[in-house]
């Protein structure tokens, strides 16, 4: 995939970035016209998430950003599965190390309801 001449006479390195003025990526050129001279705007181009880098009114390039590695488990679940529950005590029996439950306090009535 080497460098190809761009529509504006520049070169497009399609392997590393997406040139929005290149005929190969022309469907995205509407996005470039809408963005104008923005410094860095998140965008999705052909399924690749990247940043639109445009320091001036020159052609806009989108450089793909690396995606974080996907974990098979959601964060926090690894701790749940790492420490399985201890079933040594039958259900309904409290352990001696557990703190006692607070006593229930009856609150006085605030007055008759109207």
From Swiss-Prot:
State the span of motif (PTAP/PSAP motif): 96-99
| Localization annotation | Host endoplasmic reticulum membrane; Host cytoplasm, Host cytoskeleton; Virion; Host cell membrane
Q: What residue spans carry the region label Membrane association?
A: 1-28
* InterPro entries per the UniProt record, alphabetical: HEV_Orf2 (IPR003384)
Residue numbers spanned by region Interaction with host SRC, HCK, FYN, PIK3R3 and GRB2: 95-104
Modified how: Palmitoylated in the N-terminus.
Q: Where is region (Homodimerization, and interaction with host AMBP/bikunin) located?
A: 72-114
Q: Where is this region: Interaction with host HPX?
A: 28-68
Keyword Lipoprotein listed: yes
Span list, region Interaction with the capsid protein: 48-72
Note the topology in the membrane: Lipid-anchor
Q: Name one GO cellular component term.
A: host cell endoplasmic reticulum membrane
Question: What UniProt keywords apply to this chain's record, in alphabetical order?
Answer: Host cell membrane, Host cytoplasm, Host cytoskeleton, Host endoplasmic reticulum, Host membrane, Host-virus interaction, Inhibition of host innate immune response by virus, Inhibition of host IRF3 by virus, Inhibition of host RLR pathway by virus, Lipoprotein, Membrane, Phosphoprotein, Viral immunoevasion, Virion
Stretch list, region Hydrophobic: 6-22, 33-53
Task: Give the matching Pfam families.
Answer: HEV_ORF1 (PF02444)
Q: Where is this region: Induction of host SIRPA expression?
A: 6-22
Entry keyword annotation includes Lipoprotein: yes
- Where on the chain is Phosphoserine found, per UniProt? 71
Q: Where is this region: Disordered?
A: 91-114
| Entry function | Small multifunctional phosphoprotein involved in virion morphogenesis, egress and counteracting host innate immunity. Plays critical roles in the final steps of viral release by interacting with host TSG101, a member of the vacuolar protein-sorting pathway and using other cellular host proteins involved in vesicle formation pathway. Also acts as a viroporin and forms ion conductive pores allowing viral particle release. Impairs the generation of type I interferon by down-regulating host TLR3 and TLR7 as well as their downstream signaling pathways.
Further facts: The viral particles present in feces and bile are non-enveloped, while those in circulating blood and culture supernatants are covered with a cellular membrane (quasi-enveloped).
Sequence similarity: Belongs to the hepevirus ORF3 protein family.
Q: What is known of its domains?
A: The PSAP motif is necessary for the release of membrane-wrapped virions from infected cells.
Q: How does it assemble?
A: Forms homooligomers. Interacts with host SRC, HCK, FYN, PIK3R3 and GRB2 (via SH3 domain); binding does not activate the kinases. Interacts with host AMBP/bikunin and AMBP/alpha-1-microglobulin peptides. Interacts with host HPX/hemopexin. Interacts (when phosphorylated) with capsid protein ORF2. Interacts with host TSG101; this interaction plays a role in viral release from the host cell. Interacts with host SIRPA; this interaction down-regulates the phosphorylation of host IRF3.
Name of the molecule in the record: Protein ORF3
């Amino acid at each position: 995939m080497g460098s190809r001449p761009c529509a504006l006479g520049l070169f497009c390195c399609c392997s590393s970035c997406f040139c929005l003025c290149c005929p190969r990526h022309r469907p995205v050129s509407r996005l470039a016209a809408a963005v104008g001279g923005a410094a860095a705007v998140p965008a999705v181009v052909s399924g690749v998430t990247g940043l639109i880098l445009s320091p001036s009114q020159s052609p806009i390039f989108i450089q793909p950003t690396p995606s974080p590695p996907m974990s098979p488990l959601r964060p926090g679940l690894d701790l749940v599965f790492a420490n399985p529950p201890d079933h040594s005590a039958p259900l309904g029996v409290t352990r001696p190390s557990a703190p006692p439950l607070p006593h229930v306090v009856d609150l006085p009535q605030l007055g008759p309801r109207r």
